[in-house]
Amino acid sequence: MNLSEYDWPCPTGITPFAHQKETAAFLAAKPKAFCFNEQGTGKTASVIWATDYLMKLKLLKRVLVICPLSIMSSAWQQDLFKFAVHRRVAVAYGSANKRKEIISGDAEYVIINFDGVQICKAEIIAGGFDLIVVDEASAYKNAQTERWKTLRDVMRHVKGLWMLTGTPAAQSPTDAYGLAKLINPQAVPTFFGQFKDMVMYPVTKFKWVPRPNAQVVVSRVLQPAIRFEKRQCIDLPDITYLYREAPMTSQQLKYYKKLKEDMLIEAAGEEVSAVNAAVKLNKLLQIACGSVYTDTKEVVDFDAGNRLQALKEVIDEASHKVLVFVPFTHTIKQISDHLTKCGISSEIINGSVPVNARTDIVKRFQEQQDPRVLIIQPQAASHGLTLTAADTVVWYAPVPSVETYLQANARIDRPGQKNTMTVVHIMGSAVEAKLYTLLRNNVYSHEELVKLYKQELSETT
């Protein structure tokens, strides 16, 4: 579709990249389509421009965006405010009644998370949506799940569906089946077993491996589709910075609030030093991450399911290897255990790993398929190491040093890096968002730390 007369609304100083314009034009011409552009290429903006263009032509009235909880506000809502400020936008999150009320309202764009679709199925069907956009669409790869069946039922009442993921069928060629059944059902057999036979064959009673032509079949059934890899987008900046929200669980919030109340009592009438502010803020960050050290050096674990899920989503969407920087020792173990449960290979580099073992881990990370993820304590490996097999850095929590932050990011930004890089910041509290801003702006000073600590105590959780 020709968007030559479209005005491409943008904030001052921002212009669409060529690949974003091409992606928007492709999607605008297709009622149902895939967008497989890699993480960090600006898929969200392309979708917003395409839908806004169709709305201006009166071909579209309402859009439902289905995405992970971690990017409802930090990606979709913020980008809609940037690139479609003239449109009505609402986030359907909270109680079931609140979500249903928002869906039944007059917002032109409604953003909801995966689980919310099942809760609000009837309201979505009756909501007058012309198009559904599914971000991180791999969540719908399994056609046997209730999540998939709910979307299938909804799509019987909605004309358009765009599915976005940077890593289609990354784990197995059979992952393409659920996606294809939603966009292009005629391309795949009626039954999953038939498709599995097309793309895999058994080598033992319990082990199946991909057929030599599996990727060709996957590419054929996942159509119509557009894909840009970061290395193809020559106008992209070398490093793209992204943010993911991971709301604290009810257990975390309870103890976070209690700790703030205790700090408020302690701070009454006292002069706050930078050292004291750093220690106290560190405790709050520990709770947000899922493990806190008591004054007696014991470790108390919290339910950090939202944060772990946000991390897994980033890893799943990454096309190459990933570095995860984690300031707290015990949280590193939590993450390692979680990735193991998810079938994601990882290794740990922290202060307790001997030099010889560290050298071996780095060599395998750079040269072999596994490990896919390195979980790193920033203070232990922010200098010197070359880790260019990764093109994505994840900050599980902010660190108290601009130098450490910059040096850690530089582990992937070294000679030998062949891809455009992405740095993702995970946050679950306002103080983390402010700390990341200080790090990005290179202004992490003692004065700013004390100021931030006082601000945090003055705000109710």
State where each predicted segment sits:
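Conserved Helicase C-terminal RecA-like lobe
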Residues: 1-4, 14, 28-29, 40-42, ...
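Conserved pre-motif I regulatory segment
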Residues: 2-36
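Short basic/glycine-enriched coil/helix segment immediately N-terminal to the Walker B
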Residues: 27-31, 104-107, 120-130, 154-156
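Conserved P-loop NTPase motor "coupling/switch" region that bridges the ATPase
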Residues: 60, 89, 131, 139, ...
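Conserved helicase motor
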Residues: 70, 90-99, 114-119, 141-145, ...
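Conserved helix-turn-beta segment of the N-terminal RecA-like "Helicase ATP-binding" lobe
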Residues: 71-95, 183-186
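SF2 helicase motor core recognition
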Residues: 118-122, 171-173, 332-336, 358-362, ...
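A conserved SF2-helicase RecA2
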Residues: 400-461
